[in-house]
């Protein structure tokens, strides 16, 4: 983990938003990117934590509907990043992340949202210290074996169950 990742099998002609992940990741790596999120709302939490661990400023625009998901994903994504030592600013329809090379780590909360929990795992890869996640069981909604897969790849994250 922590190596360069290549996403294969994504059809560039597909109507699925996932096809845009290559361009978004390339823009984040270049630094100072603006990424329209209207067609890729489910990717924003993961892309935002990648941006938090990459030097430069990344602005996600047209993402207001993220406030109406399992959690207010604009607010919970920023809270996750801030809990791990990153920074940014949330707007009504946007999220701006001020990336740096590494995050220190810390204790964060999934807020019961599977995408926030999985994004915490991604963020942990750019942390110099340990990460503890509250509500890790949120991944059960979409990928029950997520933590086993993450650990099998060498990922390390501690978790606390929600009360």
Each predicted region: which residue ranges?
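Short, structured segments at the rim of ligand-binding sites
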Residues: 1-163
